[in-house]
């Protein structure tokens, strides 16, 4: 039978499948056509995310049904050098005790007028 897979870009992919095919098989066919690795694919049908071990018939997917393809969000670990750069940019600062302005690490006075260029500075607290 023929089913359609619609991507977020609006492109529609046509696939030839059987009702007994697993979701893993469908993802493999999408990889063959589009080059998207199966671990990055999420298939949605009738508002539900399809699980790899189940078959098309389990979800009552029939001929000419449309599945929606969403890519899995990437994220998580930051490279150590980028982490150090972010920490230097965000955490290695001084804070004005009166107006809470963020200042460079070697500042001796606040740069803001509203606190009268106060010299009451503290080191920014580290993230836990």
Curated annotation (Swiss-Prot):
GO terms for molecular function: protein tag activity; structural constituent of ribosome; ubiquitin protein ligase binding. There is a cross-link at residue 48 (Glycyl lysine isopeptide (Lys-Gly) (interchain with G-Cter in ubiquitin)). Keywords: Cytoplasm, Isopeptide bond, Nucleus, Ribonucleoprotein, Ribosomal protein, Ubl conjugation. GO terms for cellular component: cytoplasm; nucleus; ribonucleoprotein complex; ribosome. InterPro entries: Ribosomal_eL40_dom, Ribosomal_eL40_sf, Ubiquitin-like_dom, Ubiquitin-like_domsf, Ubiquitin_CS, Ubiquitin_dom, Ubiquitin_ubiquitin-like. GO terms for biological process: modification-dependent protein catabolic process; polarity specification of anterior/posterior axis; protein ubiquitination; translation. There is a cross-link at residue 76 (Glycyl lysine isopeptide (Gly-Lys) (interchain with K-? in acceptor proteins)). It comes from the Eukaryota. Residues 1-76 form the Ubiquitin-like domain. In C.elegans ubiquitin is encoded by 2 different genes. ubq-2 gene codes for a single copy of ubiquitin fused to the ribosomal protein eL40. ubq-1 gene codes for a polyubiquitin precursor with exact head to tail repeats. In the N-terminal section; belongs to the ubiquitin family. This is Ubiquitin-ribosomal protein eL40 fusion protein. It comes from Caenorhabditis elegans.
